């Protein structure tokens, strides 16, 4: 037995943080780190944002939990605000992204059931996807490393290559219920789906009577410079799962749907004990207060351009370390020319936190509130880390 009482499911970095201030994290030893990991795209407004702290503490002094047996005013308000800002007519609140995806999958299957087609339950997904860690969502993601050892894969998911819309079309059968896609893959390596591909998927869904589901758990809530990433394409889904940034660090998610898509989600067919609790709703409403302020998303776009230009210069200077820059908005990736774990360690040595992803990519996911000065500081640290790695390559080559 190890010395820890915790499951050994995480390869944790040897860092423990005492508190956070905006874009900065401070360890229990007083060391400061520039946080461009953002709790894996969760801390949309950074650490200890005063508006979020005030909303949470005010609600905490009043009411924490009553269950969904009763009306929750904050839930009704946040639901209406999400409806007003999106394609959706209905919202179901959850505690996480995986729960939001479970709700999305159930909504799609239930739709076909009440329409008289219970045989339509299969969902087409894409290589490199990550939709959560439940038995259904690891089946949807289709990655062997997450499926291994958990028994038979949950039936009903058909995976095709990333952005292979021809293959998606060929995968449609009389049993297909929906197509599920991340407009920008996060875990898969910061891979945006081209607008034309989303348009074709929408056409296929309309042609075959399928529902189009977006997973915007990581790329939503302003991360790309729009409230939701799919807005760049103008292609609306029927169902969408969100989480991470909407809670700003508090555990919450939501499944959004049109009236038509949600027609089967009647009383008793789905539920949650904690989803939509007063604390989460207070924080979610506070996040929207900030993100929906006039000019906020435009400023995210401006800062994203500043950061991307700086990263491109680093890639040009150190091609043996960084091959390419990916992403959109403040959801950016370094496609590494060496193992991304080495690059991640080099950045951590510079007291900059980032997140490894698939396809040998390092994710950079700063708060949407990051300042220009902090972006320049991050670029300086990334350049220093890249230079150290490039110098080591040169020394090794000279031997």
Curated annotation (Swiss-Prot):
N6-(pyridoxal phosphate)lysine: modified positions: 244
Pathway membership, UniProt? Amino-acid biosynthesis; L-arginine biosynthesis; N(2)-acetyl-L-ornithine from L-glutamate: step 4/4
Record GO cellular component, one term: cytoplasm
Quote the catalytic activity from the record.
Answer: N(2)-acetyl-L-ornithine + 2-oxoglutarate = N-acetyl-L-glutamate 5-semialdehyde + L-glutamate
Q: What class of enzyme is it?
A: transferase
User: Which terms does the UniProt entry file under GO BP?
Assistant: L-arginine biosynthetic process
Q: Where in the cell is it found?
A: Cytoplasm
Q: How does it assemble?
A: Homodimer.
Q: What is the similarity comment for this entry? A: Belongs to the class-III pyridoxal-phosphate-dependent aminotransferase family. ArgD subfamily.
Give the keywords, sorted.
Answer: Amino-acid biosynthesis, Aminotransferase, Arginine biosynthesis, Cytoplasm, Pyridoxal phosphate, Transferase
* EC number per UniProt: 2.6.1.11
> What does the record say about how the cofactor binds?
Binds 1 pyridoxal phosphate per subunit.
Species source reads: Mesorhizobium japonicum (strain LMG 29417 / CECT 9101 / MAFF 303099)
What more the UniProt record tells us is: May also have succinyldiaminopimelate aminotransferase activity, thus carrying out the corresponding step in lysine biosynthesis.
Which protein are we looking at?
Acetylornithine aminotransferase
The positions annotated for binding pyridoxal 5'-phosphate are: 97-98, 130, 215-218, 273
């Amino acid at each position: 037995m190890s010395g820890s009482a915790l499951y050994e499911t995480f390869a944790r970095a040897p860092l423990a943080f005492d508190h956070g201030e905006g874009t900065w994290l401070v360890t229990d030893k007083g060391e400061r780190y520039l946080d461009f990991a953002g709790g894996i795209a969760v801390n949309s407004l950074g650490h200890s944002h005063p508006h979020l702290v005030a909303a949470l503490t005010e609600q905490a002094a009043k009411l924490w939990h009553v269950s969904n047996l009763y009306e929750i005013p904050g839930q009704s308000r946040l639901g209406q605000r999400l409806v007003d800002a999106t394609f959706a007519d209905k919202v179901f609140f959850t505690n996480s992204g995986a729960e939001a995806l479970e709700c999305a999958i159930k909504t799609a299957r239930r739709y076909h059931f009440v329409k008289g087609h219970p045989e339509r339950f299969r969902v087409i997904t894409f290589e490199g996807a990550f939709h959560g860690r439940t038995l259904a969502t690891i089946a949807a993601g289709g990655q062997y490393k997450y499926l291994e050892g958990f028994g038979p894969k949950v039936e009903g998911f058909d995976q095709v290559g990333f952005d292979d819309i021809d293959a998606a079309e060929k995968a449609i059968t009389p049993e297909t219920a929906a197509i599920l896609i991340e407009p920008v893959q996060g875990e898969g390596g910061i891979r945006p789906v081209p607008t034309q591909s989303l348009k074709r998927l929408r056409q296929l869904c309309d042609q075959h009577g399928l529902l189009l589901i977006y997973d915007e758990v990581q790329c939503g809530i302003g991360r790309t410079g729009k409230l939701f990433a799919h807005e760049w394409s103008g292609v609306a889904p029927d169902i969408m799962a969100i989480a991470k940034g909407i809670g700003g660090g508090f555990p919450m998610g939501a499944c959004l749907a049109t009236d038509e898509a949600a027609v089967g989600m009647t009383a008793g067919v789905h539920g949650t004990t904690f989803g939509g609790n007063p604390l989460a709703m207070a924080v979610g409403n506070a996040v929207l207060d900030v993100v929906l302020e006039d000019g906020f998303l435009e400023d995210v776009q401006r800062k994203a351009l500043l950061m991307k230009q700086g990263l491109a210069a680093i890639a040009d200077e150190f091609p043996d370390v960084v091959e390419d820059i990916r992403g959109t908005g403040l959801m950016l990736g370094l496609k590494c020319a060496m193992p991304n774990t080495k690059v991640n360690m080099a950045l951590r040595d510079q007291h900059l936190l980032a997140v490894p992803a698939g396809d040998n990519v390092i994710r950079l996911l700063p708060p949407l509130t990051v300042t220009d000065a902090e972006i320049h500081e991050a670029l300086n640290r990334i350049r220093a880390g890249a230079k150290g790695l490039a110098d080591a390559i040169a020394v090794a080559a000279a031997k």
